[in-house]
From Swiss-Prot:
Belongs to the ABC transporter superfamily. ABCD family. Peroxisomal fatty acyl CoA transporter (TC 3.A.1.203) subfamily. Gene3D superfamilies: ABC transporter type 1, transmembrane domain, P-loop containing nucleotide triphosphate hydrolases. One of its GO terms (cellular component) is ATP-binding cassette (ABC) transporter complex. It comes from Dictyostelium discoideum. This is ABC transporter D family member 1. It comes from the Eukaryota. Residues 712-725 have a biased composition (Low complexity). GO terms for biological process: fatty acid beta-oxidation; long-chain fatty acid import into peroxisome; peroxisome organization; very long-chain fatty acid catabolic process. Residues 271-296, 712-734 are annotated as: Disordered. One of its GO terms (molecular function) is ATP binding.
């Protein structure tokens, strides 16, 4: 190999204000914790709620129709309930008069009235369920559309700590929010009707003081509930976050169950005296391993578990006594001496944090339920006190008839029930508030990322750069100081590119390379040196902060990761991805030829057997578990060959396949005109590339020409040549 260019960037690292700003943008944990504390029942929460309502009613025909139907049924139910009170009074009157016929007719009429009310209540519940279903559909599709646009989901998962567990927010949080909202809307529709109608009846059957006393009684209840409910918003918000974290931990254990089991076996074979001390792991724990920062960072070993557990210690002695008491009731014990797996220990710590906050929810819920139930159960006493006022306190010596007592009592109770709906719904509102905060914050952060506000780019400098390009539409603004321009697919050029890890640590500066079509580039270096990071930057997944990149359009580039991504679908759908069967189809003969070319045509036979066995679910859901890592990589390579891009970015994409097949991959790619930028460690990769970009542990980079002494075409037999040419000439690639 001949070294043509050597660059050392150690002297080029300047902590400018711009770089400091960039680093700070990735340290968002404090901001997220601050947002948890700031979630409370206030005007800001109401404005967030209004923004969600605008989304739900963006297409107003169906939701407004359901709302009007609900309103009509609520009005009918309120009106029918009036006759229930009158008929109950008639039943009491029949007892005093001894009129049997009048009694039977009153019971029959009351039965019809109550039956009608029950039917209307069932219809209302049905409409509420339909409203929740429609709202969930609207809101979920809206957020999913934003979430998947321009790979926004990757930016959120890789860079942004402000949104924890976005999967939970899209799935369960939206479902719970819409269900609660529909229930609250139903009560808020019927509640005002009941209040207005029975305010009038109480005024006409008793006097002005009757509705006034009921109003004052429940206004006092509202104030008390407001004081109790406000802190519960942030507590419920935190509880939802902890529930999501706990679920994600077990999801990760499920995904890496085999690796965890194998590691645990090796742990059992080690003797305690031969193991490293925990202090050995503390030194140099925080590394700049950018390649692993987005994939597998913290689930294998938690070397800071002692510090993490101290966070959950209870500092309040009174609360600690209560917690210990509850632990005794539940049978918890801290005397367990059995050595736990790291994953079990992490799950235990996470679960303890979840339970601790759940206790807070339970205690605050106790206060809220107490105040709500207190005013609900005191309402009958307030009712009889109102009826007693004209008899005992206004010198009105007339004795009320049983029928009058029944009607007046019923009217007061119904008025109180209208207010009770608002008191009882306060618990639902506290839960709803947490969902509002989580859903709206996700929408807000997604919009900010789409607008590049989250990266806090220097707008002045961005405008200057746009002006310098004469407003060229081909310039893609990355929200940072780096620019990506698109060409016709002839080359990939990096000019003075400087990039960082997601934590804000600089990797390399002023990288300049030019990869022309037909000249493969190999990137080599130690693990964690930033090789994969450079691939992500070229793809546009990661921002870079200095320099420029000139590359083909996305449709002319194809990315193959080390761990292939297999969708839920058939083998044909695996090859078509990222397209679907609705957009393209592959003839069976071409499928067979492609799979034979890379010696995995037996998978097609296996698929045919699965279809004959009618194991459709196994076919569409378990390919990832059924295939070896090498088979998965070969399917991804066939996907690349089928799509035939101008450039392929391969991140150790052949690490699990034999070298004979690896050689075939590069030869087929060359025959099809696919230029490859490879990341790898194998020395055997050198002969397939013309240029080497080498990184070292000191953050130096070297660009070298590769003198290939082997003619790779001589290593592949003529039969392979004929097959390759046949595939390359097939119209399916055109």
């Amino acid at each position: 190999m001949k070294t043509t260019n050597v660059k050392n960037n150690n002297n080029n690292i300047n902590n400018t204000d711009e770089e400091i700003k960039i680093k700070n943008n990735y340290n968002q944990n404090d901001e997220r914790l601050k947002k948890i504390k700031e979630n409370k029942f206030d005007w800001a929460l109401f404005k967030r709620f209004i923004n969600i309502i605008k989304i739900l009613y963006a297409k107003p025909v169906i939701p407004l129709t359901l709302f009007l139907i609900l309103f009509g049924n609520g009005f009918a139910q309120t009106y029918v309930s009036k006759f229930t009170g009158i008929l109950l009074a008639d039943i009491y009157a029949s007892f005093t008069s001894g009129d049997k016929v009048f009694f039977l007719s009153s019971v029959l009429k009351a039965g019809f009235a109550i039956g009608g009310s029950a039917l209307l209540a069932a219809i209302i519940n049905f409409i509420v369920s339909i409203m929740a279903w429609n709202w969930r559909k609207t809101l979920c599709l809206y957020i999913q559309n934003v979430y998947f646009k321009k790979s926004l989901f990757y930016k959120i998962l890789a860079f942004d700590d402000r949104i924890d567990n976005p999967d939970q927010r899209i799935t369960s949080d939206i479902d719970n929010f819409t269900t609660l909202l529909a229930s609250i809307v139903s009560q808020c529709i019927t509640g005002p009707m009941v209040v207005v109608y029975y305010t009038y009846l109480c005024y006409t059957t008793i006097d002005w003081y009757a509705p006034l006393i009921v109003y004052g009684f429940f206004f006092l209840g509202y104030l008390i509930n407001k004081l109790v409910m406000s802190p519960m918003v942030s507590i419920n918000y935190l509880q939802d976050k902890l529930e999501g974290d706990f679920r994600s931990l077990h999801q990760r254990i499920r995904n890496f169950s085999e690796s965890i089991a194998l590691y645990s076996l090796s742990k059992e074979k080690q003797h305690p005296e031969k193991r490293f001390d925990n202090n050995d792991y503390d030194h140099g724990y925080e590394s700049d391993d950018s390649d692993q920062s987005c994939d597998e960072s913290t689930t294998i070993i938690n070397r800071k578990k002692n510090k993490g557990s101290q966070y959950y210690k209870n500092k309040n002695s009174t609360s600690k006594k209560i917690n210990d008491f509850i632990d005794k009731l539940s049978g918890d014990s801290n005397d367990q001496k059995e050595e736990l797996l790291v994953e079990e220990e992490q799950a235990k710590i996470q679960f303890e944090a979840l339970l601790k906050n759940k206790k807070r929810v339970i205690f605050w819920q106790l206060g809220l339920n107490t105040t709500s139930d207190l005013f609900t159960y005191l309402s009958p006493i307030a009712n009889y006190f109102i009826i007693a006022i004209p008899v005992f306190f206004l010198n009105n010596k007339s004795v009320l008839q049983p029928g009058d007592v029944t009607v007046q009592s019923y009217n007061c109770i119904m008025l109180a029930s209208g207010f009770s709906q608002y008191i009882n719904v306060s618990q639902s509102i506290s839960d709803l508030s947490g969902y509002i905060s989580r859903i709206s914050s996700m929408i807000e952060v997604c919009k900010k990322i789409m607008e590049d506000v989250s990266l806090d780019a220097d707008i002045t400098k961005l405008n200057e750069k746009v002006a310098q390009t004469h407003n060229n539409d081909a310039i893609i603004n990355t929200g940072s100081s780096g620019n990506i321009s698109l060409n016709n697919g002839d080359s990939i050029t990096l000019d003075d590119v400087t990039y960082f890890t997601p934590k804000g640590n600089q990797l390399y500066s002023k990288i300049s390379i030019n990869v022309k079509r037909g000249n493969n580039l190999l990137i080599m270096g130690p693990s964690g040196s930033g090789k994969s990071s450079l691939i992500r930057i070229i793809n546009g997944l990661w921002p870079f902060f200095k320099g420029s990149i000139d590359r083909p359009e996305n449709g002319d580039m194809f990315f193959l990761p080390q761990q292939p991504y297999l969708i839920f679908g058939t083998l044909e759908e695996q090859i078509l991805y990222p397209f679907s069967k609705k957009q393209k189809r592959i003839p069976k003969s071409i499928m067979r030829e492609l799979f034979q070319r890379f010696e995995i045509d037996y998978l097609l036979d296996r698929e045919r057997f699965i279809k004959k066995s009618a194991q459709v679910n196994d076919l569409t859901h378990n390919w990832l578990n059924q295939l070896s890592p090498g088979e998965q990589q070969l399917i991804a390579i066939i996907r690349l060959i089928y799509h035939k891009p101008k450039f392929a970015l391969m991140d150790e994409s052949t690490s699990s396949i034999p070298q004979s097949l690896e050689e075939r991959v590069y030869y087929v790619a060359k025959e099809l005109g696919i230029t490859i930028i490879s990341v790898g460690h194998r020395i055997s990769l050198l002969k397939y590339h013309s240029t080497l970009l080498r990184f070292d542990k000191d953050k130096n980079w070297y660009l070298e020409d590769i003198i290939n002494q082997n003619n790779q075409s001589n290593n592949i037999n003529n039969n392979n040549n004929n097959n390759t040419n046949k595939i390359a000439e097939d119209s399916v690639f055109d």
